[in-house]
Regions:
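Loop/turn elements at helix/coil->beta-strand transitions in domains of secreted/extracellular proteins
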Residues: 10-15, 40-46, 71-75, 96-100, ...
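Short beta-strand elements at the ligand-binding edges of bilobed clamshell
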Residues: 1-6, 17-21, 50, 117-129
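Hydrophobic alpha-helical
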Residues: 34, 52-114
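Hydrophobic alpha-helical segments within soluble ligand-binding/sensing domains
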Residues: 1-15, 59-60, 106-111, 127-144
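Short beta-strand elements in bilobed, periplasmic/extracellular small-molecule ligand-binding domains
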Residues: 14-17, 35-57
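Extracytoplasmic "Venus flytrap"
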Residues: 18-29, 78-81
Length: 194
């Protein structure tokens, strides 16, 4: 929902997707869900193009090719943080820092980009602590002979500039570092969290 909501709020219409081309169940589920949500819940938005990558090293080149082919793109969904950073580098070189990015996984580089008011506008963060708890509970149930699901997952958190610092604490169980907090405060669009 993060990218669709951002695009609606800012009057954007055209987006592209950059997704992993491998048989990884969780990544495929996340990518397919993102595309489905954008298509079904934001029908006024237009998917201009989709590219797939085998490894992160291809993303820089594929981002450049996608934007050159579809210069009307105003936003991108990208599978996870590493490829998103590659896309940011390509877009910066192309002078297209106006393109909004939504991605998966909260890490320092994408958090810093968001804190500084960069291209990352929304992301879906995994909750590793809670995932560990859920898996441990499933293991205990299995040992006790109780039925357990074939796949154990935990709902991710949507992270935006408005809740970045709070989400960081929720995901990593610690306060955001001083450098990240300071970058956020130096951003002229800083939103004070309650």
């Amino acid at each position: 929902h993060g990218l669709g909501e951002y695009m609606y709020r800012h009057g954007l219409k055209n987006y592209g997707v950059i997704v992993h081309n491998a048989d990884f169940y969780a990544t495929n589920q996340r990518d397919n869900a993102a595309k489905q949500v954008l298509a079904e819940e934001y029908p006024d938005l237009r998917l201009c193009g989709e590219v797939r990558f085998e490894n992160e090293g291809e993303v820089y080149r594929k981002t450049r090719e996608l934007i050159k082919r579809y210069p009307e793109i105003e936003a991108l969904y990208i599978s996870w943080d590493g490829p998103a950073i590659e896309s940011i580098e390509a877009l910066t070189e192309l002078g297209r820092t106006d393109i909004a990015i939504s991605t998966g996984d909260l890490d320092y580089a994408v958090a810093m980009n968001m804190a500084k008011g960069g291209m990352v506008k929304a992301l879906s963060a995994q909750c590793p602590f809670e995932q560990g708890q859920a898996i441990a509970l499933a293991a205990v149930k299995s040992v006790l002979g109780e039925e357990v699901p074939s796949f154990v997952g935990v709902e991710p958190i949507t992270v935006t500039p408005e809740n970045l610092l709070r989400a960081w604490k929720q995901v990593f169980k610690e306060e955001a570092g001083e450098e990240l907090t300071q970058a956020f405060k130096e951003n002229p669009n800083y939103v004070f969290e309650k």
